[in-house]
């Protein structure tokens, strides 16, 4: 007898991150979900910071002090990395949805990871002025 779907639960959420039984497509799915969650968190944080900037010149000056810190720059690099990975993985999903490269999902995924690493390195080197 087949098990009935009982609705969402925390246990079902954590199944996303269980490495057992995942093939390349499963890892691509997990990467897409994690980057989407990270970008959503960043958007919320960004809106809070914009609200602080609305407090006038003192809020803006304190923001600039924070924005020039290496930790903040590293956080920006993480956002850029998530955006690049999410965007390229989205292109892979669109291609496979339309039947392009369905039999070559592994190559597409590792290709997008390679392109992502190169682009993220270029952004990182420019952001940290290296």
Explain the meaning of each model-derived region.
Residues 1-130:
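Membrane-embedded alpha-helical bundles that constitute the cytochrome b-like, heme-associated redox core
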């Amino acid at each position: 007898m087949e098990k009935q779907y009982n609705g969402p639960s925390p246990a079902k959420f954590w199944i996303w991150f269980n490495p057992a039984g995942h093939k390349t497509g499963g890892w691509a799915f997990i990467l897409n979900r994690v980057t989407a969650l990270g970008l959503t968190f960043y958007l919320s944080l960004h809106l809070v910071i914009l609200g602080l900037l609305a407090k006038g010149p003192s809020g803006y000056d304190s923001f600039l002090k924070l924005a020039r810190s290496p930790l903040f720059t590293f956080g920006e690099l993480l956002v850029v990395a998530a955006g690049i990975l999410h965007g390229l993985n989205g292109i892979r999903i669109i291609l496979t949805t339309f039947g392009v490269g369905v039999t070559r999902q592994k190559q597409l995924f590792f290709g997008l990871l390679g392109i992502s690493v190169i682009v993220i390195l270029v952004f990182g080197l420019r952001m940290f002025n290296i």
